[in-house]
Amino acid sequence: VPDILKQSDGNLIEVGTTNRTHLSDYEKAILDKDNCAALILRAHHSNFRIVGFTTEPTLIELVALGHEHGLPVVDDLGSGALLETTSYGLGHEPTVQESLSAGADVVCFSGDKLLGGPQAGLVVGRAAVLTELKRHPLARTIRADKLCLSALSATLMHYLKDEAVQKIP
């Protein structure tokens, strides 16, 4: 994400500290006139854990804050589970559905990894925001090709038929 922001002339505004971030840290960054915040990004820490004296705002709190200030909220889930992982003896991973239900405007996740489909970056969310993304001149250069879309469609069909666990390796 930092490299993408650098290439796009975006500015990543870090808030809080490694183990303690409060909603007020986000609000201070939003209200700082030097920052020009354009969105709130929450990135799920899927491959590490911070334990001990920690705190961070919930996605619901971030969505309320973002919308209060007219900012879209992007939730980058990384792996992107569609099924509850605790049912399989794993720790809880936030699902795409949970992020959307919490009100995130955009949810980003992988097509492979936990989903079990082709390697791809997937973006779901509010139609108005996705329409804006599609209109961007670079959207054409990063869209999925027909083969990738076909494989993704087949994978998602297993989820719709409630057979993903049996059919996806």
At which residue positions do the language-model features occur?
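Structural signature of PLP-dependent enzymes
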Residues: 159-169
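Conserved PLP-enzyme active-site core in the AAT-like
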Residues: 1-159
